[in-house]
Structure formats: structure tokens, C-alpha cells
Amino acid sequence: PAGHKKAVQAANRAREAIDTAHRALQSCGQIFRYAIATGRTERDVAADLRGALVPVKRKAFATITDPAAIGALLRDIDAYSAGPITRAALRLAPYVFVRPGELAGAEWKEFNLEAAEWRIPAHKMKKRELHIVPLSRQALEILEDLRLYSGHTRFLFPSNRGNSRPMTKEGILAALRRMGYDKDVMTTH
């Protein structure tokens, strides 16, 4: 109904306004800290406003937790008629538990298949620490199959626009959406 749509739009605008206010306060704080460091002011007056803004309500990422639904998702991925690169990314994701950007940007040089591990360099990680991902037998099988398609390139999942860059994390998400899993049901994060 039209009333419901307007209520949802109003809620989204309010959430965006709160988010914008928090970002503006953060920017002001950075400006004042720079001004202090360069001798232009003595204190950060933006710090006085911390706690004055309504907190941003963070919503948990949607995920499937029901075992039967997880099984259905995995079957849908196996049956998905995407190209082999996208399908491999979707198939590998449940075995490695990394962020979509880390998966999409994975490079062959980061993998030691004999040791069954993926060593994600610190500069690629959100916390800037080396992250070692153990690889299961199933993950190794997916990687061996994938090597036929992208083993000659830098990236496991090269972009369809050229091998010199990886596919985007949005590409993985778009594949889930095409399979019918919208953002309220499943995210790749």
C-alpha cells in the first residue's frame, strides 16, 4: 500500500539524516584535530557534541541459519547457471568465511594448496593483520576446478572486463540476487 511505502521512505530518510550527522561530526573532529596539530586552535569543540547525537542503529547483516534453508541455498548455487568464475566464488564463500571484497580480490599467490591455507596479507584486511584461512577438502576441490579457468591469471576471480583486475564484491552479491536471495534474506558479508 501507498501508506506503507511512504512510511518506509520516511524511516530511510531519518536513518540517512542521522548517519549524515555522525559523519559530519566525525569530519569536524578531524578538522579540529588538524587545527590543533598546526597551532590554529587550542581545542576540539566537536568533542563537546559526542554523545549528543542519536546513536546510529545498526542492523545485523541478513543471513540464513536454518539448516534446511542453508542446504537449499547450496543446492541453488550448484544449479546456478552463471559463468564458472562467478559460480566458483559463490561455491567457495561458505567454506572460507571472509568478507566479499576479500574473496573477490583473492590472488593465486596467496594460496598454498599443499598446506591447505589461504594467507590474506594484512593490507587487504579490515584490521590490517595477516589472516590465515584454513582450506577444507571441499574448498581445495573448488580451487582445483577453478584453476582451469583462472590459474593463468593473477586473480582467482578475474573481472569479465579483463584479467588485470578482480571481479567486484558487488558481482557476487548480484549473483545472489539473481538467484532470488534479496538483501532481507541473505548477504555475502
Please place each PLM-identified region on the residue numbering.
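Hydrophobic recognition helices of helix-based DNA-binding modules
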Residues: I31-A35, L143-L146
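C-terminal catalytic core of Y-nucleophile DNA break-rejoin enzymes
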Residues: K59, T63, M125-D145, T153-L176, ...
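Active-site-proximal binding-pocket segments
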Residues: P121
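Feature representing long, continuous alpha-helical segments
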Residues: G71, R75, R87, G101-G105, ...
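Short glycine-/small-residue-rich flexible loop motifs, especially phosphate/cofactor-binding loops
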Residues: F32, L90, L173
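Basic, Lys/Arg- and aromatic-enriched nucleic-acid-binding interface segment
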Residues: A2-S27, A37-A106, E114, M125-E129, ...
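A short, basic/aromatic helix-end/turn motif that makes direct DNA contacts
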Residues: G105-F111, T188-H189
